Amino acid sequence: MIQKNTLLEVADNSGARAVLCIGLLGGRKSASIGDTVIVSTKSITPRGKVEKGKVYRAVVVRVKSPIRKSDGSVIRFSSNAVVLINDQGEPLGTRVFGPVKKLSSGSFMKIMSLAVEVL
């Protein structure tokens, strides 16, 4: 589960490497896959689309905590990862790295189509 002050990896090519969760949308205490969080960039790559210290929205695509599927199997990722999005819900990057759990919300279909592997 993702909560405030959680350090997250960025799973796209927007230019950010690591971000810090500074808020959760919807008044929750923790976020899971498919939830939108408010993040601040902590480390960036040169010539990226984002700036260090700026605030962005992001969608959680991977969490370390185990997730039980309806068939009884369990999925566990090795890292907590997000994809940065703009105010309209579209991803800032053009590629998504690593596996992505199927996002239940229909508003993030673009992220699932950019992903290499959808579980």
Swiss-Prot record:
InterPro entries: Ribosomal_uL14 (IPR000218), Ribosomal_uL14_bac-type (IPR005745), Ribosomal_uL14_CS (IPR019972), Ribosomal_uL14_sf (IPR036853). This is Large ribosomal subunit protein uL14. The gene is rplN. Binds to 23S rRNA. Forms part of two intersubunit bridges in the 70S ribosome. Part of the 50S ribosomal subunit. Forms a cluster with proteins L3 and L19. In the 70S ribosome, L14 and L19 interact and together make contacts with the 16S rRNA in bridges B5 and B8. GO terms for cellular component: cytosolic large ribosomal subunit. The keyword rRNA-binding applies. The keyword Ribosomal protein applies. NCBIfam families: rplN_bact. One of its GO terms (molecular function) is structural constituent of ribosome. Gene3D superfamilies: Ribosomal protein L14. Keywords: Ribonucleoprotein, Ribosomal protein, RNA-binding, rRNA-binding. Belongs to the universal ribosomal protein uL14 family. GO terms for biological process: translation.
